[in-house]
Swiss-Prot record:
Gene null: resulting phenotype: Plants show overall delay of growth and development, and mature plants are dwarf. Panicle of CP1 mutant contains several flowers which remain unfertilized due to the abnormal development of the pollen.
Glycosylation sites: N356
Keyword Hydrolase: yes
UniProt protein name: Cysteine protease 1
Enzyme class: hydrolase
Active site: residue positions: C180, H317, N339
Signal peptide feature range: 1-31
Organism: Oryza sativa subsp. japonica (Rice)
Disulfide bonds: C177-C220, C211-C253, C311-C364, C395-C407, C401-C422
Tissue specificity remark: Highly expressed in the tapetum and developing pollen of the anther locules. Weakly expressed in root and germinating seed, hardly in the anther-less-flower and not detected in leaf.
Lineage per the UniProt record: Eukaryota, Viridiplantae, Streptophyta, Embryophyta, Tracheophyta
Keyword terms: Developmental protein, Differentiation, Disulfide bond, Flowering, Glycoprotein, Hydrolase, Protease, Signal, Thiol protease, Zymogen
Length: 490
């Protein structure tokens, strides 16, 4: 992106993101006891009076946690190795002590709370090494002036785009794929589309994963939201999630679905960096894609409240700011941030992050690399339905060739064809050697010279005939065939 009025970002984001492998192993809701959270969350009997859970209590909590987060319950292990179950329990117990101690302090002083979520049997080092990405060299940004805060205009005290129906519910889950950048961009586009057109349409993250390989985007191996917006604008729109569903893995771009442009944008701009007031102004008008440092232990185990925990500015995760406000109980200003780890992380898939901090970068770097899609007009008209496929070519009563090919006789007696072949082009001329054919644009076939030409004496625009494949008999057990590629016509 070309620069636009501000200094270049020191480090652009290449989100390898959180690959939520554990999401695939969640059991049905009935598998978890109804009182599980009363056991695995902080209990006033522990921590406040300096007591620690006994090993038996910790194992009971771990068994309940396994029933909720791992298929197979207490006898299972993350990787199936001998001794891994015990090792995972020890990590879980250490995290449980950390959560108990933190929540005891939170109860005394007020503050955000932690919980034993799906990451509770990972050390923070494992969490960071397995699920977090890197930060490559930066590049220019397309900084817009529309939301630059001049310190004069009044902004609403609070905004929540969920209340205005501009976010898809429930929170989506990126699963075991580093596609947070795609989820962030899609959520921002879904929001602006609702604001402009009045329609809330769930859009396809998978199209971005498979088709948006521009810039720094690399499917499940990470990407950045600006490049996702650039792809959507250049492509003329994005397909729906229903038509192009998410698979949590890389794949080949489906060109037919890529051409179904249901929701479009006109472009994108970047919020002036390191300026929370400009970010606030932007979020007051629409959901905004932001990048954050999500690698801290407290972030890993976040459960509820306004997050004021330790974090840096190593931008490694893409999320969406969908609002801001002030906590009624504590008076803490916060950002409402939509994650892509499903609805069972944090506050139904959201985290409230501290706002108006001393650092210009914002909490966890939230003000460093924010961007938003631009949309001014209606969406593209629905594409006409694809034409029905042509029927197979019937050569005779017993043989046929696929649609888009031509029946040519391979072997015959007098005027009766015994064996049919299929020329790999439609409307072709069958050559007299009974084994090759010429396209209709070059109908003159010289089998001996192996040429196709436009006229009998033309020395120009000569092509080589294509070889034919055997036709399909009506009795499929007798003969099989493969149609040769059009590349035979060179």
């Amino acid at each position: 992106m070309a620069g636009g009025g501000g200094k270049s970002v020191a480090a652009a984001l290449a989100m390898a993101c959180f690959l939520l492998i554990l999401a695939a192993f969640a059991p049905p809701a009935a598998a978890a006891p109804p009182d599980i959270m009363s056991i695995i969350r902080y209990n006033a009997e522990h921590g406040v009076r300096g007591l620690e859970r006994t090993e038996a209590e910790a194992r009971a909590a771990y068994d309940l946690w396994l029933a909720r987060h791992r298929r197979g319950g207490g006898g299972g292990s993350r990787n199936g190795f001998i001794g891994e179950h015990e090792r995972r329990f020890r990590v879980f117990w250490d995290n449980l002590k950390f959560v108990d101690a933190h929540n005891a302090r939170a109860d005394e002083r007020g503050g955000f709370r932690l919980g034993m979520n799906r990451f509770a049997d990972l050390t923070n080092g494992e969490f960071r090494a397995t699920y977090l990405g890197t930060t490559p060299a930066g590049r220019g940004r397309r900084v817009g002036e529309a939301y630059r805060h001049d310190g004069v205009e009044a902004l609403p005290d609070s905004v929540d785009w969920r209340d205005k129906g501009a976010v898809v519910a429930p929170v989506k889950n990126q699963g075991q794929c580093g596609s947070c950048w795609a989820f962030s961009a899609v959520a921002a586009v879904e929001g602006i589309n609702k604001i402009v057109t009045g329609e809330l349409v769930s859009l396809s993250e998978q199209e971005l994963v498979e088709c948006a390989r521009n810039g720094q985007n690399s499917g499940c191996n990470g990407g950045i939201m600006d490049d996702a917006f650039a792809f959507i604008a250049r492509n003329g729109g994005l397909d729906t999630e229903e038509d192009y569903p998410y698979t949590a893995m890389d794949g080949k771009c489906n060109l037919a679905k890529r051409s179904r442009k249901v929701v479009s944008i006109d472009g994108f701009e970047d919020v002036p960096e390191n300026d929370e007031l400009s970010l606030q102004k932007a979020v007051a008008h629409q959901p905004v894609s932001v990048a954050i440092d999500a690698g801290g232990r407290e972030f890993q185990l976040y459960d509820s409240g306004v997050f004021t925990g330790r974090c840096g500015t190593n931008l490694d995760h893409g999320v969406v700011a969908v609002g801001y406000g002030t906590d009624a109980a504590t008076g803490a200003a916060y950002w409402t941030v939509r994650n892509s780890w499903g609805p069972d992380w944090g506050e139904n898939g959201y985290i409230r992050m501290e706002r108006n901090v001393t650092a210009r970068t914002g909490k966890c770097g939230i003000a460093m690399m924010a961007s938003y899609p631009i949309k001014k007009g209606p969406n593209p008209k629905p594409s006409p339905p694809s034409p029905a496929p042509s029927p197979p070519q019937q050569c005779d009563r017993y043989s046929k060739c696929p649609a888009g090919t031509t029946c040519c006789c391979n072997y015959g007696i007098r005027n009766h064809c015994i064996v049919w072949g299929c020329c790999p082009v439609e409307g072709a001329t069958c050559c007299k050697d009974h084994s090759t054919c010429c396209p209709k644009e070059y109908p003159v076939c010289n089998a001996k010279a192996r040429t196709c030409s436009k006229s009998k004496n033309s020395p120009y625009n000569i092509r080589t005939p294509a070889a034919m494949a055997r036709s399909v008999p009506e009795q499929p057990d007798s003969i099989s065939f493969v149609v040769l590629n059009r590349e035979d016509l060179v």
